[in-house]
């Protein structure tokens, strides 16, 4: 499948190049020595005829915004998860109460002995929840 895609791409490129060569005034794209990267001078087709011009680098104006266009930066709302955030039940600890065998075991005294180890392989919940 990839080979077929590459062949189709090469055929389209060859067709486009032959189409451009049939147009009057086509000079082609020439790169000058000493320019490495994406901002090489291009000859022909620029403003004012066939004078060379330096192409501007892409600064991220595509999808997602960035410098030079696109969407402005909009900060996301704080969804928690930072320092001091609270959870409806403690994060599962994969230690003393973290195996399938201990899931029906009573919770330690920090929960007042009310909770049962929940969430299959998780830790103890402060409520009598078993799931």
UniProtKB/Swiss-Prot annotation:
GO terms for biological process: defense response to fungus; defense response to Gram-negative bacterium; defense response to Gram-positive bacterium; killing of cells of another organism. The keyword Transferase does not apply. GO terms for cellular component: cytoplasm. Strongly expressed in hemocytes, with weaker expression in gills and epidermis. Expressed at low levels in hepatopancreas. Disulfide bonds join 103-117, 107-124, 118-125. It comes from the Eukaryota. Its main location: cytoplasm. It is found in: Cytoplasmic granule. The modification Lysine amide is found at residue 130. Residues 1-16 form the signal peptide. Keywords: Amidation, Antibiotic, Antimicrobial, Chitin-binding, Disulfide bond, Fungicide, Signal. GO terms for molecular function: chitin binding. Antimicrobial peptide. Has strong antibacterial activity against the Gram-positive bacterium C.glutamicum (MIC=0.4 uM) and the Gram-negative bacterium E.coli (MIC=12.5 uM). Has weak antibacterial activity against the Gram-positive bacterium S.aureus (MIC>50 uM) and the Gram-negative bacterium P.aeruginosa (MIC>50 uM). Has antifungal activity against S.cerevisiae (MIC=12.5) and C.albicans (MIC=6.3 uM). Has weak antifungal activity against the mold B.cinerea. Presents chitin-binding activity. This is Hyastatin.
């Amino acid at each position: 499948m990839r080979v077929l895609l590459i062949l189709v791409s090469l055929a389209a490129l060859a067709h486009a190049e032959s189409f451009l060569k049939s147009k009057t005034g086509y000079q082609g794209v020439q790169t000058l020595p000493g320019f490495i990267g994406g901002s090489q001078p291009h000859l022909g087709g620029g403003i004012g005829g066939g004078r060379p011009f330096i192409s501007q680098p892409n600064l991220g104006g595509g999808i997602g915004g960035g410098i030079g266009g696109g969407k402005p930066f909009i900060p996301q709302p704080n969804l928690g998860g930072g320092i001091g955030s609270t959870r409806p039940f403690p994060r599962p600890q994969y230690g003393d109460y973290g195996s399938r065998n201990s899931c029906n075991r009573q919770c330690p005294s920090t929960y007042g002995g009310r909770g049962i180890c929940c969430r299959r392989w998780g830790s103890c919940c402060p409520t009598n929840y078993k799931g």
